[in-house]
Swiss-Prot record:
Gene3D superfamilies: NAD(P)-binding Rossmann-like Domain (3.40.50.720). Keywords: Aromatic hydrocarbons catabolism, NAD, Oxidoreductase. This is 3-phenylpropionate-dihydrodiol/cinnamic acid-dihydrodiol dehydrogenase. The gene is hcaB. It catalyses: 3-(cis-5,6-dihydroxycyclohexa-1,3-dien-1-yl)propanoate + NAD(+) = 3-(2,3-dihydroxyphenyl)propanoate + NADH + H(+); (2E)-3-(cis-5,6-dihydroxycyclohexa-1,3-dien-1-yl)prop-2-enoate + NAD(+) = (2E)-3-(2,3-dihydroxyphenyl)prop-2-enoate + NADH + H(+). It comes from Escherichia coli (strain K12). Belongs to the short-chain dehydrogenases/reductases (SDR) family. The lineage of its organism: Bacteria, Pseudomonadati, Pseudomonadota, Gammaproteobacteria, Enterobacterales.
Amino acid sequence: MSDLHNESIFITGGGSGLGLALVERFIEEGAQVATLELSAAKVASLRQRFGEHILAVEGNVTCYADYQRAVDQILTRSGKLDCFIGNAGIWDHNASLVNTPAETLETGFHELFNVNVLGYLLGAKACAPALIASEGSMIFTLSNAAWYPGGGGPLYTASKHAATGLIRQLAYELAPKVRVNGVGPCGMASDLRGPQALGQSETSIMQSLTPEKIAAILPLQFFPQPADFTGPYVMLTSRRNNRALSGVMINADAGLAIRGIRHVAAGLDL
């Protein structure tokens, strides 16, 4: 039996991309899974696909009341909460400082930070009492942009660096009761969108990047699927496999940190 059997897991943005992969993986592990999802159509799809195995709540991660409503439903259903995974986010399609008009930069900043940073903070606030009671954990989705430049424009990169500070501070504030960690995936096949303020709300990340471009820059030389990143979340959630890690950020970058100066990888001819 999985370590996560009957564990109560709350994931934001579970309707597509990495969020959907996490929903699938935790259900496979036998967990009781809930998600807060903005899209009514995706909520309906989740309910149709997973039935009683999913508690799908329509709501906005920038609204504390929506979080509280979801947590109340989780506690009614499961009687507890073991892990909160803050995952919902938006990207800026590499919108640069120089080429973005000042007024758009300002409104784009507020929209992107509301989702990528405030959304995490509000989720942590709503979930903290239940997680303190269960001595559970929080996990926040980062990005390679939390470590390196060029994984987005200044708005997205700054938001992911802000999230690393949030993880460290919450890990400090909530210890010893709650473990708080992060996972930073590299580019993958997803439907990640951008801020409406930048005119990117209908533009998917895969319209800016191709599988070939992503694979070419990664030393492991493959195009990751969302499911490729679910393992670290499972490990961090498990009390048996992770008793000792808090304030840790796993850089799941397919080897990007060891990319060579002369070649992307030295073993291409092996």
